Amino acid sequence: MERYAIGIDLGGTSVKYAVVASSGKMPFSGQLPAFAQESAEAVLGQVLKGVEACREYAVSEGLMLAGVGVGTPGVVSADGRTVLGGAENIAGWENIPLAGRVEEAEGLKTLAGNDANMMALGETLFGAAKGATDVVFVTVGTGIGCGALMDGRLYRGYRNRGMEMGHITVKCDGEGCACGGVGCLEHYASTSALVRRFCELNGSARDAEVDGKDVVLFYKEGNPAAVQAMEEHWNYLAHGIASMINLFAPQRVVVGGGISEAGDFYLEKLREGVRRQMMSVCGEETELVAARLGNRAGCMGAAGLVLDKMG
């Protein structure tokens, strides 16, 4: 018998929402602007609109909902109730009683979790890591997020405060990062970093019209600045992934984010770099694959969390 839950994926630009079935089907979904630079209340309002749209659909179709799962940037309390902080892309997003606010407004039991963890769970339950018990999920975008499952369970660190792969040090004498650290992986290997580095090497000002897909296109055309920027990107990202393999020895590393969809050549170059840098005994059974769910992973993982805990 199919069971259903609402999955919300909150990001810096949008709020994605969906009704998700235990089989992985997604009969209803949508997206709203996040208003992330306005205020925490504005963001909460958009989350609630997404939940309400899903609830109305479920009522119209006669579907019973197990509850609501919300994937959010930042650190979430161990009980899945409160966003403690660490979401640099959402203004004022700290000490937010997220689960309580949704429950109060919609009358549905709610759990929150870190967005990368929810994506990792989504890919493990329904996507590229289905059937695996030990998985590392890496998302490469404006930042770098990471989630992991060990023995089939999300690994979050003590009180949900771990797995900030984007802020491991890859250059000990490197530049400062927005987190306050120095030489962070995110500062050198994110898509934002790739574009910034391309512009530096190309002798041009940072162009708002240039994005990661453009740099990939320039790389394919043989543009020297793009070639060097991409090689540096792969090297830094491989360093970070190899470190995760050495620590966790996962069955699969799933790489998501828009740039991971650049083509097979992108993943193959990354695999080459990872093989050079990892301990072979740690990664001899690790498969590095592209994410399969695209921008659905966060909603599907958040709903999957609720179906597991409340269904």
Regions found by a protein language model. Name each.
Residues 5-9, 65-69, 135-139, 145, ...:
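Short glycine-aspartate micro-motif
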Residues 130-188:
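Glycine-rich phosphate-binding loop of actin/hexokinase-like ATP-binding domains
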Residues 20, 111-124, 261-311:
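Glycine-rich phosphate-binding/hydrolytic loop that grips phosphoryl groups
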Residues 20, 185-254, 286-287:
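A mobile "lid/hinge" subdomain adjacent to the ATP/sugar-phosphate binding pocket shared
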Residues 2-49, 82-85, 160:
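Short glycine-rich, Thr/Ser-proximal phosphate-binding strand/loop in the N-terminal lobe
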Residues 68-74, 255-259, 291:
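Glycine-rich beta-strand-to-loop/alpha-helix junction loops that act as flexible
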Residues 36, 40-48, 52, 63-68, ...:
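Glycine-rich phosphate-binding loop and adjoining helix at the ATP-binding site
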